[in-house]
UniProtKB/Swiss-Prot annotation:
InterPro entries: ELP3 (IPR039661), Elp3/MiaA/NifB-like_rSAM (IPR006638), Radical_SAM_C (IPR032432), rSAM (IPR007197), rSAM_horseshoe (IPR023404), YhcC-like (IPR005911). One of its GO terms (molecular function) is 4 iron, 4 sulfur cluster binding. Belongs to the radical SAM superfamily. CDD domains: Radical_SAM (cd01335). Keywords: 4Fe-4S, Iron, Iron-sulfur, Metal-binding, S-adenosyl-L-methionine. Signal peptide: none annotated. It holds the Pfam family Radical_SAM. [4Fe-4S] cluster binds at C33, C45, C48. In vitro, can cleave S-adenosyl-L-methionine into methionine and 5'-deoxyadenosine (AdoH). The gene is yhcC. Residues 17-254 form the Radical SAM core domain. This is Protein YhcC. Its cofactor is [4Fe-4S] cluster. The keyword Metal-binding applies. It comes from Escherichia coli (strain K12).
Length: 309
């Protein structure tokens, strides 16, 4: 694969800027979710089973222990980003967040923070806290779970916020100089390629620094799993994902960094689509598609040109 020559990928961007590989270490801060505990809603998003992306056992270790454990699993990098991934990693009092984030950046070879959260859980005090780390020279990314820009779909999947909320949070963060990475799902019920391209267009118009693309995973324990088991919902086919994600990438300005272009999960948590079991399948197909149809930005007449070494 030659994805770095076809897409402005985060890994390549980090290597160019730091002069060596930088790896994300995922952390569990013990946070909950306001869309599950009643603060905003109950039941959570219809696609969600946090076990599909988070090791719940991690929450019983300290931040330092988690980072040490994760670093031992990585032998290709010596510098790291601390990634608070599970649940809503800004859903706590600011002093609690400060303590956790400080524990993370205090560990050896940590060069930055990536904080995953909902767009309705980022008050000014949290943005100001993240700016403190940015101003100290740390790489800071605010990763916002948007999934789609269509309010009808957001309501259908029980997100508990609308697109305008995402826009407000993104604009406030970027006005402070914080980098924003938007998480988008391809294959949501009622959405096809046209809707996904509209979402991309609205995200780019709002202003964004990074994007994560994710095929819809139907996972055990989610509300969507019940619809799938009843035959009312199907997982996205690999061909459809490749076409839609490929066109989204081709319509993305070259300066926007792709943090991810596909995602995997393991059985028995993953119910469908089973091609998502293999982390490479989606990337290999997208590599082929972009080689045939054009690189990131090519549909805009602004093709991605990887920097020369």
């Amino acid at each position: 694969m030659q994805l770095q020559k076809l897409v402005n990928m985060f890994g390549g961007d980090l290597t160019r800027r730091y002069g060596q590989k930088v790896h994300k270490l995922t952390l569990h801060g013990g946070f909950s979710c306001p869309n599950r505990d009643g603060t905003i809603g109950r039941g959570g998003c219809t696609f969600c089973n946090v076990a599909s992306f988070a090791d719940e056992a991690q929450q019983h270790r300290s931040i330092a222990e988690q980072l040490a454990h994760q670093a031992n699993l990585v032998n290709r990098a010596k510098r790291y980003l601390a990634y608070f991934q599970a649940y809503t990693s800004t859903f706590a009092e600011v002093q609690v967040l400060r303590s956790m984030y400080q524990q993370a950046v205090s560990q050896a070879n940590i060069v930055g923070l990536c904080v995953g959260t909902r767009p309705d859980c980022v008050p000014d005090a949290v943005l100001d806290l993240l700016c403190e780390y940015k101003d100290q020279g740390y790489e800071v990314w605010l990763e916002l779970g948007l999934q789609t820009a269509h309010d009808k779909t957001l309501h259908r999947i029980n997100r508990g916020h609308d697109f305008a909320c995402y826009q407000r949070t993104t604009q406030l963060a970027r006005q402070r100089g914080l980098k924003v990475c938007s998480h988008l799902i391809v294959g949501l019920p009622g959405e096809g390629q046209a809707e996904c391209l509209q979402t991309l267009e609205r995200v780019v118009e709002t202003g964004v620094d990074g994007i994560k693309l994710h095929p819809l995973h139907i996972v055990k324990g989610s509300i969507m799993a019940k619809a799938w088991e009843a035959g009312r919902l199907n997982g996205i086919e690999l061909e459809d994902y490749t076409l839609t994600a490929g066109e989204m990438i081709r319509h993305t300005p070259p300066e926007v960094i792709y943090h991810r272009i596909s995602a995997s999960a393991r059985r028995p948590t993953l119910l469908a689509p089973l091609w998502c079991e293999n982390r490479w399948t989606g990337m290999v197909e997208l590599d082929r598609y972009l080689n045939e149809h054009g690189v990131q930005g090519s549909a805009l007449g602004r093709p991605w040109l990887p920097p020369t070494e």
